């Protein structure tokens, strides 16, 4: 399945800023359905970033975040076309970022080899259980 998304200048710059903040604490970025929710390398923190305004409900997984971030910075200040090609069986696929002059394609990684994987709601709730009784503030 292949999807093509046009990302505005502002949205792409915001995406790059977020990844820049993460590159020191995460080796990978795993976006599922437009949401990046994962642990840091040392498993001491969990963070969630909503990228649905950038990538809609698509999936993008980037390994070696520091290296790929430097390549993606070449598109800052420009509208970027992103092609997401995901295979149905979970093998293969690619992510292509391009403007009118440049195109960079990343092979989709095998999820088994990613350090920082997407956390679903169930896993997050098992780590941080919350109920009405746990709330400090009331309505």
Stretch-by-stretch model annotation:
Residues 1-21, 26, 30-139:
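DNA polymerase sliding clamps and clamp-related checkpoint/processivity subunits
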């Amino acid at each position: 399945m292949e999807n093509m998304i046009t990302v505005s200048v502002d949205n792409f710059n915001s995406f790059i800023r977020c990844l820049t903040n993460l590159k020191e604490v995460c080796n990978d970025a795993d976006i599922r359905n437009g949401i990046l929710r994962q642990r840091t390398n040392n498993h001491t923190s969990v963070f969630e970033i909503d990228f649905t305004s950038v990538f809609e409900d698509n999936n993008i997984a980037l390994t070696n975040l520091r290296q790929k971030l430097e390549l993606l910075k070449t598109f800052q200040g420009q509208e970027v076309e992103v092609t997401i090609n995901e295979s149905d069986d979970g093998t293969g696929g690619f992510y292509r970022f391009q403007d009118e002059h440049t195109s960079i394609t990343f092979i989709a990684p095998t999820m088994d080899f990613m350090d920082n994987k997407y956390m679903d709601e169930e896993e997050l709730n098992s780590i941080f259980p919350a109920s009405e009784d746990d709330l400090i503030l009331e309505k």
